[in-house]
């Protein structure tokens, strides 16, 4: 095997460590740690919520920037939403991301009274974040995006008529 092809087989570096700025969301900004076992209880608190799915900070370093901006966005909107942080273990993040139809990290999943509203994926400029959050807080709830497999009835005919 050549050295060039071996480079492509090297594992992608990751870390299980939680960056301090993400820990501060829970310790100083009243965010809650959330996983697949606690999400329904957290959502039962009602109102507007933002679930932060950070991803691995080595693979997705912008998650640290989003963690810094999130409490500032909360303040701009007069604490108009609660913050949940997906537990850092990948299996927790993946289950929550799949449930709410987001595959990109980091993601801010907007929920209202337990139902999906919208998602903002990746880091944005401040003005764009403010616009997108304002839009999300005004949107009605909807179904989370799916993986794109069409749902059809077994009894459906071959045409649309």
From Swiss-Prot:
InterPro entries given in the database record: NiFe-hyd_mat_HyaE, Thioredoxin-like_sf
Pfam families: HyaE (PF07449)
Keyword Zinc applies: no
Keywords: Plasmid
Gene3D superfamilies: Glutaredoxin (3.40.30.10)
Family indicated by similarity: Belongs to the HupG/HyaE family.
Protein name, UniProt field: Hydrogenase expression/formation protein HoxO
Taxonomic source organism: Cupriavidus necator (strain ATCC 17699 / DSM 428 / KCTC 22496 / NCIMB 10442 / H16 / Stanier 337) (Ralstonia eutropha)
């Amino acid at each position: 095997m050549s050295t060039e092809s071996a480079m492509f087989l090297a594992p992608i570096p990751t870390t299980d460590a939680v960056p301090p700025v993400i820990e501060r969301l829970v310790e100083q900004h009243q965010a809650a740690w959330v996983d697949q076992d606690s999400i329904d209880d957290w959502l039962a608190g009602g109102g507007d919520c933002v679930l932060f799915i950070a991803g691995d900070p080595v693979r997705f370093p912008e998650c640290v920037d989003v963690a810094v901006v999130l409490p500032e966005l909360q303040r701009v909107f007069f604490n108009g939403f609660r913050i949940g942080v997906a537990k850092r273990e990948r299996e927790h993040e993946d289950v929550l991301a799949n449930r709410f139809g987001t595959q990109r990290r980091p993601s801010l999943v907007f929920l209202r009274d337990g139902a999906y509203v919208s998602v903002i994926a990746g880091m944005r400029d401040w003005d764009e974040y403010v616009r997108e959050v304002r839009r999300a807080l005004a949107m009605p709830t909807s179904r989370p995006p799916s993986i794109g497999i069409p749902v059809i009835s077994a009894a459906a005919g071959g045409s649309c008529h």
